[in-house]
Design a protein with these regions (language model features):
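Pol beta-like nucleotidyltransferase catalytic core
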Residues: 1-26, 33-60, 67-159
Length: 159
């Protein structure tokens, strides 16, 4: 699944780069960039915060669409007040409020043009309350410490 997911992510990034040539890339996807196509050089940052804090949007593509599984790919941008353009967890809307992310349903359905349209929109500015709510959920509900605390004081971890 991981290699297949990485292959889908690479194809999606190639399509996005074709539609948004000014995009900045960050992370392991930039290794072997000769296969991606023309784009601004990879961001020379040391931390994820440096990569996300100055941007309105971040494309976040998981390795698959497993229900109830999401990773730092959606969490890290939200914590940095950046709206994720997200493909992954098939029931992500169960965990985060509408507007706190933009979901891509199908990576094969012109993802590059979808991303180009989203970044030209005011979605980020119009949904800051939802982004704040998503941050609060990450910090105070989904994070490890609140989860352990709840497990210690409750009979039902999922209440």
């Amino acid at each position: 699944v991981t290699l297949l997911g990485h292959h889908h992510r690479l194809q999606a990034i190639q399509d996005i780069v074709n539609h948004v040539p000014d995009i900045h890339l960050y992370g392991h996807i930039t290794k072997g960039t000769e296969n991606i196509g023309p784009f601004k050089k990879p961001l020379p940052v040391r931390t994820k915060e440096e990569a996300f804090l100055k941007y309105r949007y971040a494309v976040a593509i998981e390795n698959g669409q497993t229900p109830h599984y999401f990773s730092e790919k959606i969490i890290d941008p939200i914590l940095c007040w950046t709206t994720p353009i997200y493909w992954g967890c098939s029931n992500i809307s169960k965990y985060f409020p509408k507007g706190s992310f933009v979901e891509i349903k199908d990576l094969n359905a012109g993802v590059g043009s979808q991303v180009a349209s989203i970044i030209e929109s005011q979605h980020h500015e119009e949904n800051m309350d939802a982004l704040a709510e998503a941050r609060d959920l990450i910090l105070n509900k989904y994070n490890l410490i609140p989860t352990i605390e709840k497990a210690l004081v409750s009979d039902n971890l999922w209440e």
